[in-house]
Structures are given as structure tokens and as C-alpha cells.
Amino acid sequence: MKVTFYEDRNFQGRSYDCMSDCADFSSYMSRCHSCRVHSGCWMMYDQPNYMGNQYFFRRGEYADYMSMFGMSNCIRSCRMIPMHRGSYRMRIYERENFMGQMYEMADDCDSIMDRYRMPHCQSCHVMDGHWLMYEQPHYRGRMWYFRPGEYRSFSNMGGMRFMSMRRIMDSWY
């Protein structure tokens, strides 16, 4: 898996090749305005240490990603998303700490309100696979990356309320 970052738009200026997670680009380049994802899927963050807004990038060229995604800040850190082969399973909960209504999911859901009559979820347990969750129905708005693990509360995620979710499939690589 590899991504090349460029200081300027249209793949100009100094570049940095990245083949694993990078918590802070500042030691390699002062800014980043374009990138080429040669292989793999990546989460990009507009703050160091995998903080701030998250953006999903898959194989392709992003000559001016800030305009493309409506970003106000440059990418400052990135995380490689490992390829997952196998089943996908996640439990979503109506309230924090795995309380309230619970639903188990194994496929994409473009609206938890339409499917489960649940306005949003506030905690989840990802058992299998890697997922993207979105603050609005139909995979819109800000997103957050979830890998296997327990997420007891979304309150530390900038007050995000998730209303749709999709699997990161191996066909995206």
C-alpha cells in the first residue's frame, strides 16, 4: 500500500511517499495539497495524530483534494486501512455504553432511521471488518472510520451522530 503526497496542487512541489501510518507530516513537508493513492485505502486527517475531520481515499489521483472534498485544512496525518477478507459484523446501539435498542448489521445501511426506526446510534461494537459511518443518511456528511473494537460513546468524536454506515470492501482496493 502506498500514497504519494505533494506540497502543491496538481502533483507539484516536494513529495513524500508513505507506505504506512503517519501521525504527522510536518517533518516531511510543510503542507499537502494533492496526492496519488497508488494502492490501498486510507483515512486522511486534517490534524496531526489522527485527529480532526476524517476523509476516505481509495486508489486514484487527487490533484486538488481540498476543493474536491470541501476541506479547509490540509492533510496532516494518515492511516492505512488494512484489507479485510471475510464477513462483516457490527452491533449498533441507540444509547451510549451499549444501552437501548441494539441491531446487528452485516451489510451497508443508507439510513438507520428507515431500516430500524432509530434516529441515530451512540455506541457500537465492530466484531468483523472495517466500516465508515456517516453523520447523515445516504452516506453523506462527515464520516468516521471504525475498525474492530468496542466504541462505548461517540461524544468524544466531536458530537457526531451517525445515521448511515457502509463496509470498506476489498473491491475498493
UniProtKB/Swiss-Prot annotation:
Residue ranges annotated for the Beta/gamma crystallin 'Greek key' domain, each copy included: 1-39, 40-82, 88-128, 129-169
Gene3D superfamilies: Crystallins (2.60.20.10)
Disulphide bridges: none
Domain of life: Eukaryota
Entry GO MF terms: structural constituent of eye lens
InterPro entries linked: Beta/Gamma-Crystallin, Beta/gamma_crystallin, G_crystallin-like
Keyword set, alphabetical order: Eye lens protein, Repeat
Region called Connecting peptide, residue ranges: 83-87
Biological process annotations from GO: lens development in camera-type eye; visual perception
Domain notes: Has a two-domain beta-structure, folded into four very similar Greek key motifs.
Described purpose of this protein according to its UniProt entry: Crystallins are the dominant structural components of the vertebrate eye lens.
Family (UniProt): Belongs to the beta/gamma-crystallin family.
Assembly and binders: Monomer.
PANTHER family recorded: BETA/GAMMA CRYSTALLIN, CRYGM2B PROTEIN-RELATED
Designated name of the protein: Gamma-crystallin M2
Source organism: Cyprinus carpio
